[in-house]
Structure formats: structure tokens, C-alpha cells
């Protein structure tokens, strides 16, 4: 329903957008009413199993309330401590990792990515599953190729916010790594981010191509600067908003060097 509402909006179908938006919200309310136990999501109505993937799907589509997020983070953390594995195959992995990054659990995602080591060691493409290489488990399969989507979007923080990347959202997840460099080729040109953490300070460089604009979303950013000076007064920075739980920065095309305290 969410995707249908977005498609209707693009097509100028206001009635369709409203209809699908209402259906999406009704479904969300029912999921929260009937498929939640102790703050996490049930696998189904008939049983009270709470596999992490059930909560991951809910997080991916924005079902939980903000008040549920601490309990959901705890749910994933406890599952990882207990098993050091999520028992999720190729198909569900994309949803699992997206939920981990959305909940700022990048360190757990980084550790779980180690299951790709045997594919890399064999110098082959992404297999259908994470089992041993065999005639039935080889070749390039989209089920396990999702790091090519997940890592640029969440570690690099780059995702489209307008048609043809006319607008870009920059929202890196800094938890779990010390540095990252990312570039994404678009019809507008190459969007680049690189960041590193040192002594409690995060340094974030951004490059946006011509005729594009960006919204940078950071954790609450103390001592925010751009190019060594005030971010609010920096050329190309249109607005800086300090909101509950995050800092938003509107920027135009160009190159930026932000720094802030974590």
C-alpha cells in the first residue's frame, strides 16, 4: 500500500494516494494490535514465536512506534549475543540488515557480514544461499547480492530523495566502523561521501553534482562546523535544524567538509 500510494502521487492521482495511504495505516494499526508481544513482533497469529526477521520486516516498513525502538534494539542485541547468528538466509538478509542499520546497530551488521567470507575466498559471485559451494548453490543470485544496495545506502548514507537523484538524502550510520568511502553514479553525476571517526570527532566529506540538492541527517551534532567555520554560515548550506534526536542540514550542489562531536 505504501508503494502504491507513492506511485499514485507520482501519477498525480490524489484520490488513489489517499486511498492507499489509508489502507496502509489501517494495516499498520492491525499489526500493532495483533502481532506484538512484549514490544517485539510475532511471526504469525497462530503462534507466539518472535524470530528477529519478523521484527525486521516491521522496522523496514515503518510499522513500530518510536517508543518501541529501544525494546526492538534490545531484541536484536539479545538474539545476537545468544546465537552469534540470525538464522536468516539469502532472501531475508536484505530486510535484516536494513532493520539493523535503521536501529543504529551497525556493529552487529558488520559482524554478521562475515558470513560472506567463504564466497570471497572462493573468488566467486554471490551465491543463492550461505551453504557450501555446490552445483545447486553457485552463480550470481540476487538473494545474496544486497550488500551492493545496503552498504551505499546506510554506511555511505546515500539514497535518492527525488526523481533521477535531483534530491539526495545523506544519512550515514556511523556505528560499527571507523571510516567509510562511498560513491554512487547517478544521471546527475557522482555523489560521494567519506567519513572517519577520531577521538570523538566525526569528519564527513560530501560531494553533490550540479543541479542537485541534499538533506544531510546526522545524530545530534555538537560543535558542528563546515570547512572549519560555522556550518550555518557556510556557502551552499541553506539551513541547519537541530531537532529531537537528529540534526538536519540542507545543502546545494558542491563539496562540503563537516565535522562534529559524536
Predicted regions and their residues:
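Catalytic cores of carbohydrate-active enzymes
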Residues: 2-139, 143
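Non-catalytic C-terminal accessory modules of carbohydrate-active enzymes
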Residues: 10, 22, 107-262
